[in-house]
C-alpha cells in the first residue's frame, strides 16, 4: 500500500468514509496528498452542495478545495434566506437540517398579542418566536427526504426554551407526530416542561386531581407509561422529540412533523421556539 501511486490511493479512499480520509494523512505523505484531493472529497460531498452554497448567506466565499467545502458544511451553513441551517457530520457525512421558527408554522405567530419575535442571543437564527399566551398550540414543519442522507434513520426535535414566567405547560400533555406521505407514522405525547415536584405538590393541594382529569383529554399513545418531557441540549436549549422516520435510496417523500395541544383549552405561555431539527439517529 505504501508504494501505490497517489491516484490509486485516492481512488481507494473515495470508497471509504470521511473519517478514514481525515485520518489517512497520518499514514504517509502519499496518503496525505491523496486524502486532500478534490477527487476524494467530491465523493463525500452532498450531491446538491453547489446549490446549498449558492443559497447560503456566505455564497460569495471562494473555496480553495473540495475538502475546504466539506469542512465548511461540517461547521454548518445558513441557507434559504437564513431560514434553515444545513450541516453534515464530520466523520459520517450524514446530513442534518434545522428549520428555523420562521420556516415552520406556529399558531398565531403573526398576532403580536399572542406571539412575539425577537433575537435570542444563543439562537442560530436572527429571530425566535416566544409564545405569550394561547389556549391552542400547533407547531408544524415539513421536509423532503431527497435533501437528506438516504437509507438513514432520522429523528425530529423541537428546539425550545421555557421562560421564567412560563405557565400552563404542565397540565395537559401535547401530542407529537411524524408522518410521511409514503405511510410512516410515529405518534406520542409529551409535556412542554420538566416536572417540578414542589409545584406539583402545591397544585395537588389547591386543585386536587384537576391535572389528572385534564390529562385524560389526550389519548395515551406512548404505551410505556413514561412521562415524556423536554431534554437539555449541549447548546443551552431544550428539545422535545417529535418522532422518527427512515429515508430510502431513490425515494422522494414528504415528512410532516408536528406538536399540538388543542384539547385542554388551557391558557399557556412562556415557550421560546427556535425551530425543528432533523438529524440522523446514531446506530446503537
From Swiss-Prot:
One Pfam family matching this protein: PP2
PROSITE patterns linked to this entry: FBOX
GO MF: carbohydrate binding
InterPro entries: F-box-like_dom_sf, F-box_dom, PP2-like
Top-level lineage group: Eukaryota
Domain F-box: 1-44
Transmembrane segments annotated in the record for this chain: none
Name the UniProt record assigns to this protein: F-box protein PP2-B13
Gene coding for it: PP2B13
Amino acid at each position: 500500500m505504501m508504494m501505490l501511486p497517489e491516484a490509486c490511493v485516492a481512488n481507494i479512499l473515495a470508497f471509504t468514509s470521511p473519517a478514514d480520509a481525515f485520518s489517512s494523512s497520518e499514514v504517509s505523505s502519499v496518503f496525505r496528498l491523496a486524502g486532500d484531493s478534490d477527487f476524494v472529497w467530491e465523493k463525500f460531498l452532498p450531491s446538491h452542495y453547489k446549490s446549498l452554497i449558492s443559497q447560503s448567506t456566505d455564497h460569495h466565499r471562494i473555496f480553495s478545495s473540495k475538502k475546504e467545502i466539506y469542512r465548511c458544511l461540517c461547521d454548518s451553513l445558513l441557507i434559504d434566506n437564513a431560514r434553515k441551517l444545513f450541516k453534515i457530520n464530520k466523520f459520517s457525512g450524514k446530513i442534518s437540517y434545522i428549520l428555523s421558527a420562521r420556516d415552520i408554522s406556529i399558531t398565531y405567530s403573526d398576532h403580536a398579542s399572542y406571539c412575539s419575535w425577537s433575537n435570542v442571543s444563543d439562537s442560530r437564527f436572527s429571530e425566535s418566536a416566544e409564545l405569550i399566551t394561547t389556549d391552542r398550540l400547533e407547531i408544524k414543519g415539513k421536509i423532503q427526504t431527497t435533501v437528506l442522507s438516504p437509507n438513514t434513520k432520522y429523528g425530529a426535535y423541537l428546539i425550545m426554551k421555557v421562560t421564567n414566567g412560563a405557565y400552563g405547560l404542565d397540565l395537559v400533555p401535547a401530542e407529537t407526530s411524524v408522518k410521511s406521505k409514503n405511510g410512516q407514522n410515529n405518534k406520542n405525547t409529551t409535556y412542554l416542561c420538566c416536572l417540578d415536584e414542589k409545584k406539583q405538590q402545591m397544585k395537588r393541594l389547591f386543585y386536587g386531581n384537576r391535572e389528572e382529569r385534564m390529562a385524560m383529554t389526550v389519548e395515551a399513545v406512548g404505551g410505556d407509561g413514561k412521562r415524556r418531557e423536554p431534554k437539555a441540549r449541549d447548546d443551552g436549549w431544550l428539545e422535545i422529540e417529535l418522532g422518527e422516520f427512515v429515508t430510502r435510496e431513490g425515494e422522494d417523500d414528504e415528512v410532516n412533523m408536528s406538536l399540538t395541544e388543542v384539547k385542554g383549552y388551557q391558557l399557556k405561555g412562556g415557550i421560546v421556539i427556535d425551530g425543528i431539527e432533523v438529524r440522523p439517529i446514531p446506530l446503537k
